[in-house]
Amino acid sequence: MEVLMAERADLVFHNKVIDGTAMKRLISRLIDHFGIAYTSHILDQVKTLGFQQATATSISLGIDDLLTTPSKRWLVQDAEQQSLILEKHHHYGNVHAVEKLRQSIEIWYATSEYLRQEMNLNFKMTDPSNPVHIMSYSGARGNASQVHQLVGMRGLMSDPQGQMIDLPIQSNLREGLSLTEYTISCYGARKGVVDTAVRTSDAGYLTRRLVEVVQHIVVRRTDCGSTRGISVSFRKGMTERIFIQTLIGRVLANDVYLGLRCIATRNQDIGIGLVNRFMTSRAQPIYIRTPFTCRSASWICRLCYGRSPTHGDLVELGEAVGIIAGQSIGEPGTQLTLRTFHTGGVFTGGTAEHVRAPSNGKIKFNEDLVHPTRTRHGHPAFLCYVDLYVTIESQDIIHSVNIPPKSFLLVQNDQYVESEQVIAEIRAGTSTFHFKERVRKHIYSDSEGEMHWSTGVYHAPEYTHGNVHFLPKTSHLWILSGGPCKSSLVPFSLHKDQDQMNVQSLSVQERSISDFSVNNNRVKHKLFGSDPLARKGRRISDYAAGSERVISNGDGDFIYPAILRENSYLLAKRRRNRFIIPFQYDPEWEKELTPHSSTSITVEIPANGILRRNSILAYFDDPRYRRSSSGITKYGIIEVDSIVKKEGLVEYRRPKESRPKYQMKVDRFFVIPEEVHILPGSSSIMVRNNSIIGVDTRITFNTRSQIGGLVRIEKKKKIELKIFSGGIHFPGETDKISRHIGILIPPGARKKMDKGSKGKNWEGNNWVYVQRITPIKKKYFVSVRPVVTYEIADGINLVTLFPGDMLQEKDNLRLQVVNYILYGDGKPIRGISHTSIQLVRTCLVLNWDQDKKGSIEKVQASSAEVRANDLIRYFIRIDLVKSPILYTGKRNDRSGSVIPDTGSYCANTNLFSSKVKIKSLSQHQGTVRTFLNRNKEGQSLIVFSSSNCSRINVSKYHNVTKESIKEKEDTPIPILNLLGPLGTVPKIHNFSPSYHSITHNEILLNKYLILDNKNPKQTFQLLKYYLVDENGRISNANPCSDIIFNLFGSCFLPHDYCEGTSTTRIISLGQFICENVCLSKHGTRIKSGQVIMVYLDSFIIRSAKPYLATRGATVHGDYGEIFYEGDTLVTFIYEKSRSGDITHGLPKVEQVLEVRSIDSISMNLEKRVEGWNEHITGILGIPWGFLIGAELTIAQSRVSLVNKIQKVYRSQGVQIHNKHIEIIVRQITSKVLVSEDGMSNVFSPGELIGLLRAERAGRALEEAICYRAVLLGITRASLNTQSFISEASFQETARVLAKAALRGRIDWLKGLKENVVLGGMIPVGTGFKRFVHRSREYNNIPLEIQKKNFFGGEMRDILFHHRELFCSCIPKPKSFHNTSEQPFYAMGSNPIVHKSGFIIS
């Protein structure tokens, strides 16, 4: 102290801020210099001084101290601009999702970091004494990153899985967060209290397991006599700090020489002075003793452990170093989980170094040495394999830059670069221990549509029938817009591929309809009329030819809400022996209908397409005759006693006729409404028979009446309860009315009624129904009920339906209009809730003239489609068939077609299937494309609507060559025909070489189908659906047909022929066009998509969304499969460095320690271990091979495990001494697994034994023991100790104890835990002396007596579980420690060099 006072004049005065780390260094140097007691005295004074100053300053924190950096606004704007450009590139399909994610994260991370630096500068310049600024640097409260979140921006957050959310939080906490930002910030992992709680318990459990593994490790010897060491040399890339940390407090394993002079001796501990000498001299590698090199198995010696971190001198005997080690690793975890802030673990694959241009100029390099590639961000670049010399020529000087191999060159040859422009990116060194993990990123579909792959990519699924494909190269996946009608099987007869239909949004509740082929052989196609109000003011876009069908079936019991649609006409054209009905709409109907009604004409075509005479072709349900409530139908006026004769016309009898239809000649009929409740026989009814109730009276426990009136109850099997609305009349004796049980009274007949009758029910101008009710004999009263009257109009006659046809040649087919009432006279109508009941149906009955030659009983009906003037019209075609029908194919075969004898072929007769689910079509108008379902039972449809298509006009005639080119004289080559839309190819049986088709351009084009001369009878297959590739190939999706029909090769001229015609690009059908591509001189911007129709002056694009997928990505689903919104399209597997963040670090530490990690760390170790085991034994022979193989693998894996765990903690600025980690790692790597190959009698195969024990046993026995090194996790290691009491108190108590009992294990109570459990004294600290004393006495007993005791006791353990016993049974009086002093390596003491720079000697 006096010395200090005397020298005070010479002391240096430091005017410097001391932060936490400087304080730590100061304290450690004080301890080194003065010792602990004196240091604590000094620190006490510092503490007092600190508190005095803090009180005097009295720093407080107000909200005004939180100053936002002014430059924040333009920094954020700049980042947003970059993100926008990136988003565009992603939209155009230039960058895939992972690249976008990486880049946006780096953009925002850079912005955030830059803002953080700006924040410090800003504080220093504007307000250096700002309390926020002072606190963040003193370490008193928060750190720079936390303050940055208060006044800068919060930046990027992780989601709970540790993935970055690429939407940054731009606000800071001072400005306040928006709702979205708040949600994300809650998401940001560990933000929540919950997360902290969970992680804390995780950290606690980690500590528990760590302590469990190493609790028995105590310092028991001064020197174990080990001659091995681990080499430490000052490598490139190693910071001084790490070098010092590694060496200080260790003990040297060998002498260290500088030249010939020995500067340090073996077993000397290394202090700061010695380290400085090592660093200045940079001597040869220094060998130090570590817990790894200690020769003992279940304890450790003082010299291998080194200095105690607390006192700074060699560790004391009896110190429980294991528990200290476990706690030192676990405790930072507990602490760090409470740090809830996180700046964002960034996806940098190791930060890349950039090479910048030295001056302006033109850049030149040898293009043969580079090849094009993509950078991590999806930018185009060149990868160079060897050193590349790049020259930059400016006006007067040539600069030469050397670019190392495996770098990315970011500029092109001969490009002009500016000074300081980045021209290359050097990849970060791969040797660094980066926590790389392979991450799967799923890309989901944004819209529903059809999957499409680009050309030139061969996609083979991994398994034969799998639908998971790996991409061999980078390519685009397209989702062509349009979704299926959401049904498994929709049998559409009339929709063809590429038809355009008009779908207003309709929601039909899904009903599963049973197989209707049993009771009714018909399917009904509903053609729906439209709502007149909806059409006004609506423009139909020019290519949207509308016609729309929804299929219903059954007997009309299901009545679906009609689809309202634009043009649905029904119009007849009569031709010779053929009758064509186009589906159109007559505007005359609008006037007849009430505004809210919806008309629907349902055309019935039987499933086999054959109609008989007098069968109903179509029917029309007039909405005026629709009821939703129950009632009774009555015809005629009973009061006048003129009951109209009704003829029951049972029409078209079938095996199971569902109900007769009544053809009527009356002009009106009546429905008497009543409310009917059919109740189970056991139900309790709360109203009496013949009583009068009001509206909403409770009838049973859970039903209420909807109308008021008289209650009638009939009891049969079930109780039928009817409520008659209306009034009650008690007649006098003179009333005429009493004779009738039930009559209808017209409005004029009221006055004749009895004037004395009470009640107001008689008044009014409506018909009433009078019914006599006799509740008991001779007492009766009359119920008067209102009646709903329906007038039957003349209905729709044929003239209104079918405008006259000019070209009537033979009127040999007739249609009659017939009205049918669906319910007989007096029949009750039962309404089901929420459905409407059709009372009258207007039907079209088909009839035809008798032919003189004979009667024709059947006609053939099919649907046809004609396109003209941009409109597609659909017709029902009815052919008279004179001869019996030939059935081809099976009866129920969907593809079986009907071929008449006469040779006229009728297409697509049987496209129905019997199971139907109708679901909602909610789209606007669109085109239909049929495709086959996976289960091959029926067709489904894709509807893509006009909102998904765009029409582009391009300059005229640039895609048509004027003349046909002739190659050979005879072969007709087709005129270039890109005009027609894609239509399906019909089956052509009597094949003619040219056929006509009506296209959109009102011109008939001859398409010549060229046939091979070798194969004249080429069959054409009806494609169920096909997809067009970019180069015009058509893939046939029907696996059953083996005929591949190349439509484009035969119909269209390939566009390679049009060489000199025009400079603008040829647009071919089926070509994919990315957004932003210029297609004509006017530079129209278009959306991305596939060309589906090409006209002379324009073409139509079906919009599609491109997704870029890189090589090795997994594509889910097959070509042409339908994807819904949110389905997984592609899975990318990419590497990212893990976020260097402790709570994501903890799981990492745990994964390393448990050796079960999902990422590549321990997998590599496991593989390495196996590889070593094989090679070494092959080289060195069995006993040495096993020993050295195990030793080397263990040494290797130990070093890499220690490094990986250290990396996590260092990334958080937590310093843990290597010794602690080494003790843990030593425990999880010290076991070997006995393998089956050697049949030794001592250990059973699959047993885990310590490596040292295996060595000794191998040396003692004549035969070799085969074993290999294994990495145990900490849990497994704690369940494989020498003490079963310790194991049982950890996990699986019953199992451990049962096994121990069966094996007769002995617990020698050497660890701490066993003694605590049994209440003994623990063998550490002061209790250690007694333990050592006891074991020494035991060692001195002569061997013979030991043997007697051993075999005299009840010892059944043949496996000798305890090493000391085992050693003492071998007849060698020497102690094992002496034998182990000789090096046991076959190669002497030559050090073995290991890749990572550590040398194992």
UniProtKB/Swiss-Prot annotation:
- Protein residues bound to Zn(2+): C224, C294, C301, C304
Q: Which reaction does it catalyse?
A: RNA(n) + a ribonucleoside 5'-triphosphate = RNA(n+1) + diphosphate
The EC category is: transferase
Q: Which GO terms describe its cellular component?
A: chloroplast; DNA-directed RNA polymerase complex; mitochondrion
- List this protein's GO terms for biological process: DNA-templated transcription
What does the cofactor field's note say? Binds 1 Zn(2+) ion per subunit.
Q: Which keywords accompany this UniProt record?
A: Chloroplast, DNA-directed RNA polymerase, Metal-binding, Nucleotidyltransferase, Plastid, Transcription, Transferase, Zinc
Instruction: Indicate where this protein resides in the cell.
Output: Plastid, Chloroplast
* Single GO MF annotation: DNA-directed RNA polymerase activity
Q: Which cofactor does it need?
A: Zn(2+)
* InterPro entries assigned: DNA-dir_RpoC2_beta_pp, RNA_pol_beta''_euk, RNA_pol_Rpb1_3_sf, RNA_pol_Rpb1_4, RNA_pol_Rpb1_5, Rpb1_funnel_sf
In terms of Pfam families, this protein maps to: RNA_pol_Rpb1_4, RNA_pol_Rpb1_5
Q: Does the keyword Transferase apply?
A: yes
Supply the EC number(s).
2.7.7.6
The protein's matches in SUPFAM superfamilies, at most eight in alphabetical order, are given as: beta and beta-prime subunits of DNA dependent RNA-polymerase (SSF64484)
**Can you tell me which family this protein belongs to?**
Belongs to the RNA polymerase beta' chain family. RpoC2 subfamily.
Q: What is the protein's quaternary organization? A: In plastids the minimal PEP RNA polymerase catalytic core is composed of four subunits: alpha, beta, beta', and beta''. When a (nuclear-encoded) sigma factor is associated with the core the holoenzyme is formed, which can initiate transcription.
Per its database record, what is this protein's job?
A: DNA-dependent RNA polymerase catalyzes the transcription of DNA into RNA using the four ribonucleoside triphosphates as substrates.
Matches recorded under NCBIfam families: rpoC2_cyan
Cite the HAMAP family for this sequence. Answer: RNApol_bact_RpoC2
Protein name according to UniProt: DNA-directed RNA polymerase subunit beta''
Encoding gene per record: rpoC2
